Each structure stands twice: as structure tokens, then as C-alpha cells.
Design a protein with these regions (language model features):
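Solvent-exposed soluble domains appended to multi-pass membrane proteins
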Residues: 1-336
């Protein structure tokens, strides 16, 4: 299953995408914050808490410093059983002059962390990779693997380095899927993987075709990043990619419910509402607009029926992140 998710930002703000992905809470209600630095995550509802309620062992990892966005404390507060950072990734491998761990090396080290998790529990692993982090002018041209076919003028060399990183990410993901397929053949353990880009590069507006569509559509397209859901066993909805189907373009907040649904796990009422919302308004942005199921963008106040759906979501979100004493917790956890 593959398509595009819509990131809250362009050119940065990984933590915003990370928060929306884990919590399914849109930053539309809090557009100017860095979630892990500003929000009280104690007893926060998230994909982590939902899976722990189902008996999962949980692990979060990032092959870089633990201080970025306070991940060292934020992940533990969210409920991850264990967290791992650069010292737990011993395979030091970089691409050319770039200082960041390659995805291939990251996945190889992650395999060891994954295999060390409890064998008697299902496992949830959350990884934030680092290979394709900006900037994209670190390597000499001879290090580029991919060269853009389109002339981007002064952005040619930057585009080449960026696309070379994407190419390497693609190959590394292939290595990971081969490993997980072999694991299934050896152990019978089923694994489903969701992979998504955190945000488009900062130069995207400089290389975008501004004649292609209006500014409302363009800003959504510029914040679109690829996602895929893959499993080492047959997925019922595999191959859904048409321009208007529900899997083609969706908000980052809807990725976790979509993953949980395709994994065949119980859905919280919050996730159920988001999946229903996805049928009518699959994109609810951190800007002042949203996209309907036909790919048409709207600003709030244009369509009363769609507004009601979106406002219903925001009411649920407000209850979720507001005062915990008045939160209707049954809406945000699986029924036991």
C-alpha cells in the first residue's frame, strides 16, 4: 500500500511529523509549537500506549544524538520500553562527506536490537533515520549516484545529492524487507512496516512548478511525502494507488490508524473516527485548509458538511490533549 502523507511543515520540523504520526493529533490546533519540547506527554494517548495495552513490547531508536527534540525523555514518557541512540548503532557508515549514518547501516544495527526484544510478546519498533538529513551540498559532484533529468539551474547539484540519498534509502529499504522476509520464513513471525518521509526538503518551493496548480493545492503538494505500508505476508489492500482512493493521499495523523487497521488490530474509537474522516477529508492540514476525497482543497467555512467532520475531529483531539481529569479515556484506548 503506498501513496503520500501530508507533513505539517516543509524543510524541517521532524518532531512535528513524528508527533502527528505517533499521537494522531493534528498540529492545526497548536501550529507554532515543537511538540516534544512543549507538551506534557505524561499519560498521553498514542500508538505506543495503544499497542502496550495489547501486550506489545515497544522500542524507539534514532542513530544520532539523544538530545534532539528531547527524544531521550519524550520517548520514555510516551511509554516506550526501551530507547536507543547513536551509541547503540555500532556500524559507522556514511555516504561520501556527509556525516550521517546511512540507512543501510542503521537497518543492519536495528536488526540486532529487534532480535533482542522479548520473544514472548509482539513487538513494536519506531525508528527515526538520519541519512537524508539536510543540507544537500556536502558531497562533491562525483559522489552523486543520481543526476536529475530536469534542469534545475542553481539547484542542480543540490537536487542530485538529495536524489542520491533517496536512491540509497530505497535500496536500504529493500535490504530490510529481505531480512524481514527471511525472518518470516525462519520463525513465522509476521511483520508489517509503515515508512513515511518526515518532510520535503527546504528547497522544494524553488524547484516546484508554480504554474501547475493554485497556491492552496501547491502548498499541500509541497508538504506531500511518500509513504508505504509493507508486510512480509499478503496484505488485503496491497496495490491501492489510484488518484482518488483513500490510500493515495492522507494526513500524517491518519497513518497510524491506517497501519493498525491493515494489521488487523483492534481500533480505538478515536482511530475509528479518523478512518471515517479519511473517507471524506483525508487531509486536514496544520494550515487553514483541508482536502476532500476527490482531491479538492477547501478552507474552513466553505462546506458545512465537511466542516462538521473536521470540527468533530478537533473536538476529540481537544479532549485528548486537554485536561486529563476531564478526558473521556474510553475514546482513546482499545476496548478490553
Amino acid at each position: 500500500i503506498y501513496g503520500h502523507t501530508i507533513s505539517p511543515h516543509v524543510g524541517g520540523g521532524t518532531n512535528s511529523s513524528e508527533y502527528e504520526m505517533l499521537s494522531s493529533n493534528s498540529l492545526m490546533l497548536m501550529p507554532s509549537i515543537t511538540p516534544f519540547n512543549w507538551l506534557n506527554l505524561h499519560k498521553a494517548n498514542s500508538l505506543v500506549s495503544n499497542l502496550k495495552d495489547l501486550g506489545y513490547a515497544t522500542l524507539a531508536a534514532h542513530p544520532y544524538t539523544n538530545s534532539n527534540y528531547r527524544r531521550d525523555s519524550a520517548w520514555l514518557t510516551l511509554g516506550f520500553d526501551e530507547t536507543h541512540f547513536q551509541n547503540d548503532f555500532p556500524t559507522k557508515e556514511t555516504y561520501g562527506s556527509r556525516p550521517y549514518q546511512t540507512d543501510s547501516a542503521t537497518y543492519r544495527d536495528l536488526e540486532g536490537l529487534y532480535e533482542a526484544m522479548p520473544e514472548d510478546q509482539p513487538r513494536f519498533v519506531f525508528l527515526v533515520s538520519i541519512q537524508s538529513h539536510g543540507d544537500y551540498d556536502m558531497n562533491p559532484p562525483e559522489e552523486d549516484i543520481v543526476h536529475a533529468a530536469t534542469d534545475y539551474g542553481e539547484y542542480d547539484s543540490i537536487m542530485d545529492e538529495y536524489l542520491s540519498n533517496i536512491y540509497m534509502t530505497d535500496r536500504a529499504f529493500g535490504e530490510l524487507t529481505e531480512y524481514l522476509t527471511e525472518q518470516y520464513e525462519k520463525t513465522g513471525r509476521k511483520v508489517i512496516v509503515a515508512m513515511a518521509g518526515d518532510h520535503a526538503p527546504s528547497f522544494v518551493d524553488h524547484v516546484a512548478d508554480h504554474t501547475f496548480t493554485d497556491e492552496n493545492n501547491l502548498q499541500i503538494l509541497e508538504r506531500s511525502t511518500p509513504y508505504l505500508i509493507w508486510a512480509n505476508y499478503p496484505l488485503e489492500n496491497a496495490g491501492q494507488t489510484s488518484a482518488t482512493d483513500e490510500y493515495n493521499r492522507m494526513d500524517m495523523c491518519m497513518l497510524a490508524p491506517t497501519l493498525v487497521e491493515n494489521a488487523g488490530l483492534p481500533l480505538t474509537p478515536y482511530y475509528q473516527y479518523l478512518l471515517a474522516l479519511k473517507q471524506v477529508a483525508p487531509v486536514v492540514t496544520a494550515a487553514n485548509d483541508y482536502m476532500d476525497a476527490d482531491g479538492v482543497t477547501h478552507t474552513y467555512g466553505e462546506n458545512a458538511e465537511l466542516d462538521a467532520w473536521v470540527h468533530g475531529y478537533f473536538n476529540l483531539e481537544y479532549n485528548n490533549i486537554g485536561a486529563k481529569a476531564t478526558r473521556q479515556q474510553n475514546l482513546f484506548q482499545v476496548e478490553k
